[in-house]
Amino acid sequence: MLKVKRLEEISSCHSSNPLEKVAFFQCMEEVEKVKCFLEENSGDLDLQSGDNEAEENVWSNRALDERIIVKGGRTSALTDDIPAPAAPFDHRMVMAKHASVDNLYTVSKSEILGGGRFGQVHKCEEKATGLKLAAKIIKTRGAKDKEDVKNEISVMNQLDHVNLIQLYDAFESKHDIILVMDVEGGELFDRIIDENCNLTELDTILFMKQICEGIRYMHQMYILHLDLKPENILCVNRDAKQIKIIDFGLARRYKPREKLKVNFGTPEFLAPEVVNYDFVSFSTDMWSVGVITYMLLSGLSPFLGDNDAETLTNILACRWDLEDEEFQDISEEAKEFISKLLIKEKSWRISASEALKHPWLSDHKLHSRLSAQKNCNSGVLNLTTK
């Protein structure tokens, strides 16, 4: 059985920065033997990859025909299933201004909301309106960096959904580009590693429904996120169950006839086709959805090794299980949901639309049972603490 680390350990010993090309291929050299073995055993499936790419697109066209592209419609009536609030401004088309952000906004350099490979996110306020926002300051070292950020702006201009962070303004200077966006509470990752935050299966259902709704919308717009992970899921506030997906810096426009390959991402969440430098598609995001589900339910990382090379080896082998004690009280529906996503052959994974129809996310009787179980456990906890 694959040895996994708790997320508390991950946060202290494992970097979540995306792989640089050199580091990526250095890791790949170490797992080449495993890769070759796996390719020999899956050759028949790989021959079908071209057809599978076309087949994966059928459901998206059908969804468009049915006119179900929604800005934030809900798919269930759970007690806590309240839609995430819309951004405090109308969706707008943004172009980077060649001007100073300080002309229109007060950026608080001391109030840092988060950070990553790109730089830092600071609290900011629009001077004319007092609107509270967030300023993502992205350092750009050359033309390629600027092109990447402008791609992120282009992607965000196309996305208008309550579960996706919204872009308000942008500014370009010689050494950076600043994106002014809607501001939210904190990372879902913070909740996972918080010992005082007891995520239940029902909580996880609420989170995953919203993630799938946001991803379904992106896929209907033919956009792949390609960097889904708990750090890129923001909770609206500390206590609410509403979330928004952020960071579209690695997102790509998906054109089925133009085979897309990528060699970036966060090791733990990479799909096998990314590790293999094979074609990616909608189902590449769905693999990451499976990993996130596994983490939220158990606090464990399904493929994490002692180093990046071992992690990639585990992913290529699709080596995971549900045998840890953390899954003892998890429903069979949840386990089946994960098993529909963590599949090496990408064409076999369920789509975001299909995920939302899966019993784990759509069965009201199951949700009622889990709610009763949650209330029962809360009652027992209250008695023991008195």
From Swiss-Prot:
GO molecular function, one term: protein serine/threonine kinase activity
Domain of life: Eukaryota
Keyword 4Fe-4S on entry: no
EC number(s) stated in the UniProt entry for this protein: 2.7.11.1
One Pfam short name: Pkinase
Catalytic activity: L-seryl-[protein] + ATP = O-phospho-L-seryl-[protein] + ADP + H(+); L-threonyl-[protein] + ATP = O-phospho-L-threonyl-[protein] + ADP + H(+)
Signal sequence region: none
Location of the Protein kinase domain: 107-361
InterPro entries tied to this protein: Kinase-like_dom_sf, Prot_kinase_dom, Protein_kinase_ATP_BS, Ser/Thr_kinase_AS
Keywords: ATP-binding, Kinase, Nucleotide-binding, Phosphoprotein, Serine/threonine-protein kinase, Transferase
Residues engaged in binding ATP: 113-121, 136
Modified positions (Phosphoserine) in chain numbering: 100
PROSITE patterns hit by this protein: PROTEIN_KINASE_ATP, PROTEIN_KINASE_DOM, PROTEIN_KINASE_ST
Record: active site: 227 (proton acceptor)
Sequence similarity: Belongs to the protein kinase superfamily. CAMK Ser/Thr protein kinase family.
PANTHER family xrefs: MYOSIN LIGHT CHAIN KINASE, SMOOTH MUSCLE (PTHR24342:SF20), SERINE/THREONINE-PROTEIN KINASE 17 (PTHR24342)
Protein name: Myosin light chain kinase family member 4
Species the sequence originates in: Mus musculus
Name of the coding gene: Mylk4
